Each structure stands twice: as C-alpha cells, then as structure tokens.
C-alpha cells in the first residue's frame, strides 16, 4: 500500500471519527464484523418468516370465515324461500277451520235436498282446493286422534277421564294443528286421556 493511500484512509477515518463525535455509544454502529451483520440478518429473516406465517394463518382464517358467512347466507335465503308463506298460511288457517266447521254443521237432510246439493258440493270443493293449495306449499295437518301426546306438536287443553285408552293418548281434537314442511305452524289443541278417579 502506498503512503498516499494510507494517508487517505487515515484522513477518512479521522473524518468519520469527527462526524461521530457527539453520537451516543448505543447508536454507533461499531459492529464491524460480518458475523454480527449475518446474525442480525438471520434474526430479521426469521422475524419476517414468522410474520409471513402469521399473515398466511390470518388469511386462511379470513377465507374460512368468508366461506362460513356465505353458507349461512345461502341457508338463510333458502329458508326464506321455503318458509316465506308461513305468516300467510298461519292467517289462513282460521279460514280453513271455519270452512271445516261449516261443512260439519250441514245436516244430512240438507245434503240430500236438491236445492242445497250444489251449495254443499261447492263448499266441499272449496275445502278440497284449500287442502290442495296447502299441500303445494308444504302445509300439512298434524295427526292427533288416538296418538300419544307429543308436546312438540300437540297442546293439551284438558284431560278426559277414561279407561278405554292408555293415559296420555289423545281422545279429542278441538282444533287441528298444522306443520309447514318440518316446522310447526300451529299445534293441535287436544284432550288427553287420564285414568278415572
């Protein structure tokens, strides 16, 4: 190495030292060794790798949550379509009840009277049409008579003392119950057998 080069290096070192005056020791980069720099780079690389892994996990969780939300939304939409007529069907049940009562109230002699045969046939046809429309929309009548009481479908209104059937068996139906597909629309109001006193 020439003297000029040594002088330049010494001058550069002196200039650097002069600039570093007043800088606290903990802020000075005195490492100087490649091993320390390599360790710092390795630590930084490991930190970045762990951050990347955490970001990947968060992305997977976000994708899974998005998929779950989409599935729930699709199910809600399907349920809304399937059970859209629930309110209307519940309201129309009282009309069906009144129509059934009207048919039951027609005495046999009026059914046979030529003047009323058309009226009776019309009321019965209306009842059949209503039942058909109910079936098209998934509304079905709940079976009750002679079956054991099912609190999910029947509402016990009274107990009837009798020895003819097992206690807990439905012996009287005061109001028909209905389901809309697999959901209860209205429970059957029933009388249930009990052992006589």
From Swiss-Prot:
Gene3D superfamilies: 3.90.20.20, Head domain of nucleotide exchange factor GrpE (2.30.22.10). Coiled coil: none annotated. It is found in: Cytoplasm. Residues 1-31 have a biased composition (Basic and acidic residues). The keyword Chaperone applies. Pfam families: GrpE. Keywords: Chaperone, Cytoplasm, Stress response. The keyword Secreted does not apply. Residues 1-48 are annotated as: Disordered. Its main location: cytoplasm. GO terms for biological process: protein folding. One of its GO terms (molecular function) is protein homodimerization activity. It comes from the Bacteria. Signal peptide: none annotated. Homodimer. PANTHER family: GRPE PROTEIN (PTHR21237), GRPE PROTEIN HOMOLOG, MITOCHONDRIAL (PTHR21237:SF23). Belongs to the GrpE family. Participates actively in the response to hyperosmotic and heat shock by preventing the aggregation of stress-denatured proteins, in association with DnaK and GrpE. It is the nucleotide exchange factor for DnaK and may function as a thermosensor. Unfolded proteins bind initially to DnaJ; upon interaction with the DnaJ-bound protein, DnaK hydrolyzes its bound ATP, resulting in the formation of a stable complex. GrpE releases ADP from DnaK; ATP binding to DnaK triggers the release of the substrate protein, thus completing the reaction cycle. This is Protein GrpE. The gene is grpE.
């Amino acid at each position: 190495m020439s003297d000029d080069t040594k002088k330049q290096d010494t001058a550069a070192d002196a200039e650097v030292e002069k600039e570093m005056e007043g800088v606290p020791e903990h802020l000075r980069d005195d490492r100087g060794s490649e091993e320390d720099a390599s360790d710092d780079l390795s630590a930084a690389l490991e930190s970045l790798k762990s951050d990347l892994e955490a970001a990947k996990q968060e992305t997977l969780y976000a994708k899974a949550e998005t998929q779950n939300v989409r599935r729930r939304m699709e199910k809600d939409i399907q349920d809304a379509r399937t059970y859209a007529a629930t309110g209307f069907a519940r309201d129309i049940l009282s009309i069906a009840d009144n129509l059934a009562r009207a048919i039951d109230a027609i005495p046999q002699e009026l059914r046979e009277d030529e003047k009323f045969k058309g009226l009776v046939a019309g009321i019965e046809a209306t009842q059949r049409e209503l039942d058909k429309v109910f079936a098209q929309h998934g509304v079905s009548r709940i079976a009750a008579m002679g079956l054991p009481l099912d609190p999910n479908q029947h509402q016990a209104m009274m107990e009837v003392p009798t020895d003819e059937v097992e206690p807990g068996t439905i012996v009287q139906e005061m109001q028909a119950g209905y389901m809309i597909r697999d959901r209860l629309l209205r429970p059957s109001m029933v009388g249930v057998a009990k052992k006589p006193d």
